[in-house]
Amino acid sequence: MADLANEEKPAIAPPVFVFQKDKGQKSPAEQKNLSDSGEEPRGEAEAPHHGTGHPESAGEHALEPPAPAGASASTPPPPAPEAQLPPFPRELAGRSAGGSSPEGGEDSDREDGNYCPPVKRERTSSLTQFPPSQSEERSSGFRLKPPTLIHGQAPSAGLPSQKPKEQQRSVLRPAVLQAPQPKALSQTVPSSGTNGVSLPADCTGAVPAASPDTAAWRSPSEAADEVCALEEKEPQKNESSNASEEEACEKKDPATQQAFVFGQNLRDRVKLINESVDEADMENAGHPSADTPTATNYFLQYISSSLENSTNSADASSNKFVFGQNMSERVLSPPKLNEVSSDANRENAAAESGSESSSQEATPEKESLAESAAAYTKATARKCLLEKVEVITGEEAESNVLQMQCKLFVFDKTSQSWVERGRGLLRLNDMASTDDGTLQSRLVMRTQGSLRLILNTKLWAQMQIDKASEKSIRITAMDTEDQGVKVFLISASSKDTGQLYAALHHRILALRSRVEQEQEAKMPAPEPGAAPSNEEDDSDDDDVLAPSGATAAGAGDEGDGQTTGST
């Protein structure tokens, strides 16, 4: 055991020193020479049995202090003792060079005594899990590419670990939401798509196969080249390359995918694609950017195309029709407006030239809605304009004495009630007669607003007038409708009623006195010889004349009583 422990130290120390060197130090030819040694298949075959059966060797391996880095850099270890190692130390050396467990970190190559290769278990789990298992997929992929644990093809113990320290720890991380980089790498493509759909075989053909048998077919020089290329890449680049390779595989053979992935193959499903969208897709595919993936983000393309279509349609619709514009070109009735204006011009010959000029100015080729409306109203408004006519009422030769607002009622004999004729202006006019210069008076009443004549009567001596109440006067007058005498009632304010009654009573008394004077003038003068003829005849004449005088006196008393009562 002492000899075995002495031989372990030079075999285990080189991986520790070489791990701190530059990662791409070994050349492909040197790796090929190391992998062609004869005892490595046997040591690799014995690895599963000796890993758990020698805990003391693992303890010695864990407690062994590392050598200083300066010594390892100055004096590299000779490869001769490695060829003479027994199977157990060579197994430890190959295991430390090939890779460590994901939980190890920097001390993973020291704790390889209890190591059991979980290669197939992690690879099968990556097939069933969804995108959160990208870290496990990457770790399993990197473990397969350097052929260290596959059927004796492991290089010598001096080969450094092909995985970065960040990838040796299998820590679950959230999905990266950054846009994938345009750089395409064909080395790392997981065996499952982004949505859990299995990718076709030709897409994953560029990547090393997941089974140990297919990995054994590859030469060690190719494996070394891939190790050097993979060690130079960063983990973020690997993630972006995974996404870009998936997109490239989807481009190559989209028809082979049996499951549905949302947002893919929109060109085959949607029939609303224009040539502009196709050209935009070709330009995007020819000039990929870092923000948008190449020809896969169809939604942004459709949004931009819909915005362009909306702007184009808005421009086209704005050029087509605007409400209220060019009415003279669309409407078939403008000639009617011209006819109306011509008719108005015929009626008003004086304003003919001005109206024609205004109509021509108001109807240009392209006029606005307000202008056309103003022209229409101006053309139709001429119909309502009436010529100024001198008003003749027939009262021009008369002088107005009294004017008042009142209501006029007429008495209906059949119904024995008062019927209203209307409400308006009552005027009392005086007119000098041409014969002897006597006054002739009349009452004229017209309705308010329409000025319809509802009362027109002259004053005569036998006209009856009395004051029915403080605010009403009852008179007899001629009716204009049936040309007969009817009883009318004038209702007004108390002041106007008193003034009207006094004026009417004064004029009627003057007419009566005039009639009496005419009667006295017509009576013949008595002869002087016939006067003392007979007393009986005189007494008889006195008896006949007395009733007439009494009646006349009674009538005079009634008139005086009415005048005093009215005043």
Swiss-Prot record:
Residues 378-518 form the RanBD1 domain. Its main location: cytoplasm. Widely expressed with high levels in testis and heart. Residues 1-263, 332-373, 515-567 are annotated as: Disordered. It comes from the Eukaryota. SUPFAM superfamilies: PH domain-like (SSF50729). Changing residue 121 to A: Abolished nuclear import. Keywords: Acetylation, Cytoplasm, Nucleus, Phosphoprotein, Protein transport, Transport. Residues 125-134, 184-197 have a biased composition (Polar residues). Acts as a cofactor for XPO1/CRM1-mediated nuclear export, perhaps as export complex scaffolding protein. Bound to XPO1/CRM1, stabilizes the XPO1/CRM1-cargo interaction. In the absence of Ran-bound GTP prevents binding of XPO1/CRM1 to the nuclear pore complex. Binds to CHC1/RCC1 and increases the guanine nucleotide exchange activity of CHC1/RCC1. Recruits XPO1/CRM1 to CHC1/RCC1 in a Ran-dependent manner. Negative regulator of TGF-beta signaling through interaction with the R-SMAD proteins, SMAD2 and SMAD3, and mediating their nuclear export. Interacts with CHC1 in a Ran-stimulated manner. Interacts with XPO1. Interacts (via its C-terminal R domain) with SMAD2 (dephosphorylated form via its MH1 and MH2 domains); the interaction results in the nuclear export of SMAD2 and termination of the TGF-beta signaling. Interacts (via its C-terminal R domain) with SMAD3 (dephosphorylated form via its MH1 domain); the interaction results in the nuclear export of SMAD3 and termination of the TGF-beta signaling. This is Ran-binding protein 3. It comes from Homo sapiens. The gene is RANBP3.
